[in-house]
Amino acid sequence: MQQSKEERVHDVFEKISDKYDVMNSVISFQRHKAWRKETMRIMDVKPGSKALDVCCGTADWTIALAGAVGEQGKVVGLDFSENMLSVGKQKVEALQLKQVELLHGNAMELPFEDNTFDYVTIGFGLRNVPDYMHVLKEMTRVVKPGGKVICLETSQPTMIGFRQGYILYFKYIMPLFGKLFAKSYKEYSWLQESASTFPGMKELANMFEKAGLERVQVKPFTFGVAAMHLGMKPESK
């Protein structure tokens, strides 16, 4: 029987959890850290605020958010892979971040009341969910009026020549890196599949608006290899 997308993604991340952080650095040539840092600068996270990191994985962005909100704030990281969360919990405990809570859960059904968080993020996770729009609507639901929803994700480069090189890299070279460094050719083949079918920047910006967000900002990184999308939930009338 053919696996659903959700089942396949779950299996992938359960299997690669122990090598995920290393492979992120290898695959992006360490650029993912700079992309996240610039995204955080644009977000302008206020101390004492409350944030949710959806599809938090091994909790790197969760930890960055914890540093921004400070000890008086609160950050919740949510992921459906218990193995990925286990790696994240080790990091959080090592840093003694009491303002962080990591939860096992599904991005399609966020277990929170409406209007709970000041910031809701998803980093390199939206492409892996069964329904992009449904998850964006869930993120919009749980963010407070005036709060921000942010997605940092791979994208589709548009520059001629660079785009072709990007496609070749993701299709052939990245899975080989997976086999070499993580013994996971099959799992890293999935990552290129999910990236290649993910919406482009303009299409995702339109989805943000359809999800109920306004003042949508788009910031491409490294010639469009990745992009930040940020939208605000309208203030209550």
Curated annotation (Swiss-Prot):
GO MF assignments: demethylmenaquinone methyltransferase activity
Reactions performed catalytically: a 2-demethylmenaquinol + S-adenosyl-L-methionine = a menaquinol + S-adenosyl-L-homocysteine + H(+)
The protein's annotated pathway: Quinol/quinone metabolism; menaquinone biosynthesis; menaquinol from 1,4-dihydroxy-2-naphthoate: step 2/2
Gene3D superfamilies in alphabetical order: Vaccinia Virus protein VP39
Family named by the database record: Belongs to the class I-like SAM-binding methyltransferase superfamily. MenG/UbiE family.
Matches recorded under SUPFAM superfamilies: S-adenosyl-L-methionine-dependent methyltransferases
Residues that hold S-adenosyl-L-methionine according to the record: 58, 79, 106-107
Family matches, as Pfam families: Ubie_methyltran
GO-annotated biological processes: menaquinone biosynthetic process; methylation
Task performed by this protein: Methyltransferase required for the conversion of demethylmenaquinol (DMKH2) to menaquinol (MKH2).
Keywords (A to Z) from UniProt: Menaquinone biosynthesis, Methyltransferase, S-adenosyl-L-methionine, Transferase
Protein name: Demethylmenaquinone methyltransferase
EC numbers on record: 2.1.1.163
Xref: CDD domains: AdoMet_MTases
